Curated annotation (Swiss-Prot), chain A:
This is B9 domain-containing protein 1. Component of the tectonic-like complex, a complex localized at the transition zone of primary cilia and acting as a barrier that prevents diffusion of transmembrane proteins between the cilia and plasma membranes. Required for ciliogenesis and sonic hedgehog/SHH signaling. It comes from the Eukaryota. PROSITE patterns: C2_B9. Keywords: Cell projection, Cilium biogenesis/degradation, Cytoplasm, Cytoskeleton. Part of the tectonic-like complex (also named B9 complex). It is found in: Cytoplasm, Cytoskeleton, Cilium basal body. Residues 8-126 form the C2 B9-type domain. GO terms for cellular component: centrosome; ciliary basal body; ciliary transition zone; cytoplasm; MKS complex.
Length: 198, 192
């Protein structure tokens, strides 16, 4: 029996390029991946933590990390396609690190170079009393596990405030996805309508 | 060269069925009068469709955005269907709700869209509408808030009973969805 491939590979390299947070400075970010049961990383780094960056002096006020990502996954089934989860932290007025944003996006599906702008958000206190205590104690609400932002269930109880965004670029190579019968189309946006950025 | 092109490995659970993966995000919404918004969503398919994995309905987080021109939900979607036919291609229906500072929810818009049949990544904008009600109800809504809602969500994605409604345009929902197809070529079905 001629045995064809039984798994496909998804190789992603890229970088967390930069962020826009008009209100905050001296930020660093962490990244990790969330993927389904059929998926497994075969090589590369599954999580990382960047340097602390300050805003540029010029008018653009960019926060540049230029932080590398390299990972390869294998799977038999696109269900549970990996998502990159990014969380951004920075010092508050007392010098304690607090979260400034969580965000997630699926890794691109087609071979080639892709750029993604990920909107970031932080959870909010659900009651006025909690809001007061968090203001008084100088601790703002955080997710105990940032990976919840890649999950769809149980989000109806979450209140968030969106602020800022992170720009990530990816280079994607796939292997044997077509041989296993999957058609992911080609090109990034075959019939794209322009997405308005905040 | 390709002696095994016709002997591809198919998963045993659905050896002969065509498969559709729908993966992506409900990104957020813009163009609404207020932007403290959340969204209830669901996917409706015909009888020939079988859900193999994933969830087909849910509710997003409530966003109170810092800058008030767009609400972000970044709500992930991941579904795997098997189908015997093209009839009843999946439709996504959306309900956008506004949450005020007291935690009260009011309906801001309904919308539906067909999942694109072309494989690939699609950036989509789905315009929404809400029922208008009678003029008495409209005046009441100006003072009290709230407003008429549909009794059955089938009106959102069905066309047969819409002629009874008077509606008004609301904002739009931004989505990015990737469609992955499998085994459609086997049956001569051309999707791209």
């Amino acid at each position: 029996m001629a045995s064809g491939p039984s798994v496909f590979l998804l190789n992603v390299s890229g970088q967390i390029e930069s962020a826009e947070f008009p209100e905050f400075d001296d930020l660093y970010c962490k990244y990790s991946f969330v993927y389904g049961h059929d998926w497994a990383p075969t090589s590369g780094v599954e999580e990382g933590i960047s340097q602390i960056t300050s805003k540029s002096q010029g008018g653009k006020q960019a926060l540049v990390w230029n932080f590398p990502i390299e990972i390869t996954f294998k799977s038999t089934n696109p269900f549970g396609w990996p998502q990159i989860v990014i969380s951004v932290y920075g010092p508050d007025a007392f010098g304690n690190d607090v979260v400034r944003g969580y965000g997630a996006v699926h890794l691109p599906f087609t071979p080639g170079r892709h750029a993604r702008t990920i909107p970031m958000f932080v959870p909010e206190s659900s009651s006025r009393l909690q809001r007061f205590t968090s203001w008084f104690m100088g601790r703002r609400p955080e997710f105990t596990d940032p990976k919840v932002v890649a999950q769809g269930e149980g989000r109806e109880v979450t209140r968030v405030r969106s602020q800022g965004c992170v720009t990530v670029s990816f280079n994607v190579v796939t292997k044997d996805l077509k041989k296993l019968g999957y058609n992911t189309g080609s090109g990034d946006f075959p019939n794209a309508t322009t997405m308005s950025q905040p | 060269m390709n002696s095994h092109t016709h002997e591809l490995h198919y998963s045993p659970t659905c050896a002969v069925m065509a498969e559709v993966h729908i993966i992506g995000q409900i990104i957020g919404a813009s163009g609404f009068p207020q932007h403290s918004l959340f969204c209830k969503w669901g996917v409706h398919t015909g009888g020939a469709w079988k859900l193999l994995s994933g969830v087909v309905e849910g509710q997003t987080q409530v966003d109170h955005p810092q800058n008030d021109d767009m609400a972000f939900w970044s709500h992930p979607i991941d579904m795997h269907f098997a189908t015997k036919g093209l009839q009843g291609w999946p439709k996504l229906h959306l309900q956008v709700w506004h949450q005020d500072t007291f935690g009260r929810n009011e309906l801001y818009g309904y919308s539906f869209l067909h999942i694109p049949s072309t494989p690939g990544t699609h950036s989509l904008l789905s315009p929404t509408w809400r029922p208008l009600g009678t003029w008495q109800e409209q005046i009441c809504q100006m003072f009290v808030g709230g407003g008429p809602q549909l009794k059955s969500s089938s009106l959102i994605y069905g066309g047969s009973d819409r002629y009874r409604l008077q509606t008004v345009a609301m904002g739009q929902v931004h989505l990015q969805l990737t469609v992955i197809l499998r085994n459609f070529e086997r049956y001569g079905v051309e999707c791209s």
